[in-house]
Regions:
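Non-catalytic interaction-recognition regions
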Residues: 3-302
Length: 302
């Protein structure tokens, strides 16, 4: 097909397509479609996959989330796709490169034996670390602790990964990622569970009316809650889940500051108390919506 279109030619026995543009700031080599022995390459199969996806799904956008070191490869593939008109002009082909997960030594994360860490083993190690922390600090039966460790462990992994800008390398530190303090998944879950506990103790139908703030902490929490729609829209448009993570970390901090400065359940003014309860209930809804978008959930208690 590429030869019929006059795009491909033989160079040193291989079938190639020139994809360089005058405005390129760095060299973009020709895209090799077939090797000199007729064997296909990743470029060949990726181009075939684009053809098949267009045929089956007619997508508006195709996004490749892969190692950032593959950027040149996909630059070549996308340019061949445009030249050969494999997809309509308005179909967006997008490369989203991610960095590497490194150990404390700054090198790619490995097992103690020096091999590549399997995901199942990573999950097991994280869950065990969380379980140990639960048993060391809380009076909880083993079965419940194990179940909670799975939920909290998943948050540690997903939040730890997604809270970093995708294209940047980051250090995977089990102790830091499983901490219940700081910018971590377990801290976010602990905040949600704290709100659930307050609402349960309130023991009545949750009010819906938020009152005028009577302090700086309450005002800060309310203002941060109003940012949700804008943050969500920006994170979605930019494929940037780390911005959603940064937002819920700020929101969790704002709630905890309000919690420590305010006697929520002990407030004698019923209207004020109802306003507090309505506010933290909405805060919980926002936090739970965000962690659902990030791919994890909160337990009922911690």
């Amino acid at each position: 097909m590429y030869k019929r279109q006059g795009l491909a030619y033989i160079s040193n026995g291989a079938l190639v397509v020139d994809v360089a543009k005058p405005e390129d700031t760095k060299e973009v080599p020709p895209c090799i479609i077939l090797k000199s022995d007729g064997a296909s390459l990743y470029q060949t199969t990726d181009l075939a996959t684009i053809v098949e996806r267009e045929k089956l799904f007619k997508p508006n956008r195709i996004i490749y989330v892969v190692d950032k070191r593959q950027e040149m490869h996909f630059t070549q593939v996308f340019r061949v796709s445009r030249l050969a008109e494999l997809v309509p002009e308005d179909t967006k082909l997008q490369f989203l490169g991610f960095g590497t997960m490194n150990g404390k030594d700054g090198k790619p994360f490995k097992t103690r034996q020096g091999g590549v860490m399997r995901l199942e083993h990573l999950i097991r190690d994280i869950n065990d670390a969380v379980y140990d922390k639960i048993m060391a600090s809380r009076d909880e039966d083993e079965e419940t602790a194990r179940e909670n460790a799975k939920i909290i462990g998943l948050s540690a992994i997903k939040y730890g990964d997604l809270s970093n800008q995708a294209s940047k390398d980051y250090v995977f530190d089990v102790d830091r990622f499983t901490s219940f303090e700081g910018n971590t998944g377990p801290y976010i879950l602990y905040t949600i569970v704290r709100i659930k506990s307050i609402l349960k103790k309130f023991g009545q139908e949750i009010p819906t009316a938020i009152t005028v703030p009577d302090g700086a902490a309450q005002k800060a929490l309310m203002l941060d809650m109003t940012r949700f729609s804008d943050v969500f829209a920006q994170a979605s448009a930019e494929y940037a889940p780390h911005k959603l993570c940064a937002y819920i970390y700020d929101l969790a901090n704002d709630f905890n500051r309000f919690y420590h400065e305010t006697k929520i359940l002990a407030e004698e003014d019923q209207d004020k108390k109802n306003g507090y309860i309505a506010l933290i209930s909405y805060c919980k809804d926002i936090l739970e919506t965000c962690i659902e978008l990030l791919g994890f959930s909160a337990p009922e208690k911690m």
